């Protein structure tokens, strides 16, 4: 596949950014220790997996991306649209054990160096933000709820520079095979973007939705230039050999870890 995300042993990396001091990527599902399913590289401590497995996977990833896990930050995601400002004081949060810190946070941003923002995914959209000019990075977790409540707009509120200097990467997530019902479709039709561009009616109370397109449209609507938005072709629902899919695997699966950090 011709994509800016390049395969590595346990992750995909946005390779062209490495020379700019940005580490941006997402883990893949294979060659791990977890039974979600067998030999899975699960990165979530909040599912019924052995803590040892997660720690070993973290250590493996830290070595592969050359980013010490003591500098990672992980929030407790709740499918909302709250954004947290992260500093070096937060490094290590929820990495060894889960705590009450950063609870209810589905997006983070920082202007600090040597901080790796991380969150777990298994169909929802990882949205990465960066500006090398202004030394800014952010990461958002946008499922249908986060997309509908415009979590990307909430992140943009914390950007204190011209949006022409901001770049956004929309990472691997479910494809338009993901379906919603009439009630959810009606919610999306209240957004300030044309729902016809990302929702397709397939039958009674059945509508396919492309959450990647929806988030890209929202970002552009709020001032991020189209040419500054990159959307990967990778999809969790189409590439099960690489990714976990909560919906297709009926919840009995692991989670990938999306990450972004800057030197």
From Swiss-Prot:
Coiled coil: none annotated. The keyword Zinc applies. Zn(2+) binds at residues 79, 124, 141. Its EC number is 2.4.2.1, 3.5.4.4, 2.4.2.28. One of its GO terms (molecular function) is copper ion binding. It catalyses: adenosine + phosphate = alpha-D-ribose 1-phosphate + adenine; S-methyl-5'-thioadenosine + phosphate = 5-(methylsulfanyl)-alpha-D-ribose 1-phosphate + adenine; inosine + phosphate = alpha-D-ribose 1-phosphate + hypoxanthine; adenosine + H2O + H(+) = inosine + NH4(+). Keywords: Copper, Hydrolase, Metal-binding, Oxidoreductase, Transferase, Zinc. CDD domains: YfiH. It comes from the Bacteria. Its cofactor is Cu(2+); Zn(2+). The keyword Translocase does not apply. PANTHER family: PURINE NUCLEOSIDE PHOSPHORYLASE LACC1, UNCHARACTERIZED PROTEIN YFIH. Homodimer. Purine nucleoside enzyme that catalyzes the phosphorolysis of adenosine and inosine nucleosides, yielding D-ribose 1-phosphate and the respective free bases, adenine and hypoxanthine. Also catalyzes the phosphorolysis of S-methyl-5'-thioadenosine into adenine and S-methyl-5-thio-alpha-D-ribose 1-phosphate. Also has adenosine deaminase activity. Belongs to the purine nucleoside phosphorylase YfiH/LACC1 family. This is Purine nucleoside phosphorylase SAR1163. It comes from Staphylococcus aureus (strain MRSA252).
């Amino acid at each position: 596949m011709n994509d800016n995300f390049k395969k590595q042993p346990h992750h995909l990396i946005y390779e062209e950014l490495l020379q700019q001091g940005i580490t941006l990527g997402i883990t893949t599902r294979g060659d791990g220790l977890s039974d979600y399913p067998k030999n899975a590289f699960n990165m979530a401590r909040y599912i019924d997996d052995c803590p040892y497995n997660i720690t070993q996977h973290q250590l493996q990833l830290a070595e592969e991306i050359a980013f010490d896990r003591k500098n990672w930050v992980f929030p407790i995601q709740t499918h909302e649209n709250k954004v947290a400002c992260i500093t070096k004081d937060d490094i290590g949060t929820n990495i060894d054990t889960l705590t009450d810190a950063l609870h209810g946070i589905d997006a983070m941003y920082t202007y600090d160096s040597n901080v790796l923002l991380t969150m777990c995914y298994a169909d929802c959209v990882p949205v990465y933000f960066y500006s090398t000019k202004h030394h800014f990075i952010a990461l958002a977790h946008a499922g249908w709820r986060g997309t509908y409540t415009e979590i990307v707009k909430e992140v943009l509120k914390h950007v204190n520079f011209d949006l022409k200097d901001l770049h956004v990467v929309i990472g691997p997530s479910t494809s338009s095979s993901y379906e919603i019902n009439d009630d959810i479709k009606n919610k999306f039709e209240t957004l300030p973007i044309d729902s016809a561009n990302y929702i397709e009616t397939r039958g009674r109370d059945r509508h396919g939705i492309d959450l990647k397109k929806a988030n890209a449209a929202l970002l552009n609507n709020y001032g991020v230039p189209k040419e500054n938005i990159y959307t990967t072709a990778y999809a969790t629902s189409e590439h099960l050999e690489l990714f976990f899919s909560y919906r297709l695997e009926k919840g009995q699966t692991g989670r990938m870890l999306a990450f972004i950090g800057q030197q």
